[in-house]
Structures are given as structure tokens and as C-alpha cells.
Amino acid sequence: MQRTKKITAFVLAIALCVGMLPTLGVNAKAADTGKHMDVLFTHDTHSHLNSFSTIVDGKQEEVGGFARLKTLIDEQKEKNPDPLYLDGGDFSMGTLIQTVYETEAAELRMLGYLGCDVTTWGNHEFDYRSSGLANMLNTAKASGENVPSLVVCNVDWSAMEKAGLTEGQQQIKDAFENYGVKDYVVVQKGDVKIAVFGVFGKDSLDCAPTCELLFEDPIEASKKTVEEIKKNEDVDMIACVSHSGTVEDEDKSEDEILAKNVPDIDLIISGHTHTQLDKPIQHGDTYIVSCGEYGRNLGTISMTQKDDGRWNVDTYELIPVTDEIKADAATQERIDELMETVDTNYLSHFGYTKDQILAENDIEFSSVDDMYNEHEELNLGDIMSDAYVYAVENSEYYDGDPVDVA
């Protein structure tokens, strides 16, 4: 009799555990809502509309380029015709395309041409000061083209208006209203509704010395925005396009801090630090993803909604944008037209053209990546510094004082 009781109790215990499996998160894929979401992402493209030459594993390769990105995006759309495409900011500054930033808004318009749904700004969007950002936004709007929604939730307009808006702040405020910049937007993709908000990080602000705007704390502003979304919107997913970034030290990793403090965010597209994450960082039910800089990779993540409303990652891939990918002809034609504008509106004033070779040498220079990764003296940095010294010493305003580049 005692043995029978023990067996019965054991069977009941197993039955209870099996019944709890979905609650414990075991086999969560089997207990989903049937909703699926494919997300494409980029960040820190820095005006790299054209492909560029770089060193990969000791070999020179041609990588990146929006025309190749377009090919990859179209291939992804063959699998799912309506993916969500998010961008994490710093879409400008880094090539000659930046010289027509205000007059052509080339970067933002080309993101729209690729099908980007939502982006945010990064610190480099302020490089041409308040008037530059305002002019660029107004130009993009006036183009009449399909441009991405622009979101950022932590601009502190109340504090600025209380102190009295400066001319630059007023310019940006007017441009925001004209373009339609918001704290967040709601995007419908198939049967999935996604709220996407943007946030501008602390280090990004430190890296934007020409920025005149005041900002709320990114975490507190994100908390308020997520609560507003939960209160006012019936959405399946909350995503954040963040220009804050991740670093190795988790205690200083801004987007990891964001994920821990605002756990209702499902997905964070993390820009600013040029990080390439070969697998998502996960904190609770929040996933952080990054694909590296300059359009070297197209980030892809496929997710399925669980029965508790949160999301599982099914697949995650960073697709390298290499010269093996055929460039989309129509996209390249648009880029070539923009480069002609660079020739006409900028380089011609100095007697140069975009394809002109200025110098040749037999020395193998260190790469730009080396300068990012190795904070020490490098021959590329040396020649750049020497060029600045030469330019100053040969300018009409040079007063004879010694020139030093620190």
C-alpha cells in the first residue's frame, strides 16, 4: 500500500511538472501566438552609399554599398514581402556624400529608397550644427520621396522652452515639426503591430559638441515612452532604435543598462559604438542587436511571439555585403547622380573631381579600422597629421607660429 502511494505521488508530480512546462519557458516555441516578425537592421552607415575598399583578414576587399544592400533586402523580401527595416542612426558623415548633406539629404533619402521604415539620429547628424540638421530634414521632406520616420524620445523641449529657445534650437524644432519627428511611431507589418521609439545616448551627446539641444536622461525618458505606448497603443512588439551602444564593460554598456531598466522593450537596434554582435545580447526578454558600421553587413532577425506576448528569436544573421553580391542597377544609378552633384556643387570649387587620384605611393598604410582598434601611433595617422600641418603652414593666414597636432 505504501509503495502504491509513492508511485501515485510520483506520477502526479510528473503530471504537474509537464503541465507547467509552457509557464517555465520550456518548449516555448510550441506555445506561441502564431505571429512572426522579420526585422532587417543597419546603423552607423556614415554616408557610405558607395562600396569601399578595406582590408579583411589581411586582404584588400570591396565591401558595403547601398546598391548591394538593396539586392540583399530584395532577396529577404522574397522570403517575407513585408519585413520591418530599422536603422540606428549616424547615417551621415564619413564620405564625400556628406558635402551635400544639407542640400540633398542624400543619406536619409537613400535609406528611404532602400525601404527603411524608421531611423533615429546619431551624434554625427549634428556635425553641421543646428542649421545643418534643420536644413537636411527640410530638404528630405521637400523631396516628396518616401523617407523613413524619425524618432527620438528624450529631447527636453520643456527645459529649452522654459529657458527660451536659441535660434538654433528653434530651427531644429521647426524642422522637427515639418518633417514629423516623434517620440515613437506605430508600424503595421502583416498581422503584427510594432511601436518603435528612439533614444539618444549619453555618450552620443558627449560626442556631439555642436549640439545645442538639451536631453532628458535616456532611461527615464524611455520608461515614460514605453508606459505611454502600453497605455495608448495596442501593439504586439516594442522596439527601440538607440544611438547609445554597447561596450565590453556591462556596467557601462548603455543599451544593456537600458534593457535591464526598461524590460518591456522587446528589441533594441543598438548604434553608436560600431559594434558587431554575432549573436544578440539578451537581458530578460529583451534582445540587443548590432551589425557593425558603414553598411558592411545587413542585420536580420526573425522572431516568433510567445503566448505571454513576448518574443523568441528563431534566427539571427549578419549578412556580409561583399563584392560577390550583384549591385542593384537602379540604386547605383541614383548614387551616381548624387556623386555628380558632389562634383558640381563641391569639388569643382577646388579643381577636383570625385574619381581623381591625388597621390600614389608604395607604402602599405594602416587601415581606418586599425586606428579605431589600436590607439597608438600609426602611419596613416602620421600622414594625416602631416597634411594638416602642411595645410596650415601654407595657408594665407599662417602667422609663423609652430604648428603641432596633438
Where in the sequence are the language-model features?
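Bacterial N-terminal signal peptides that target proteins for export
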Residues: M1-V11
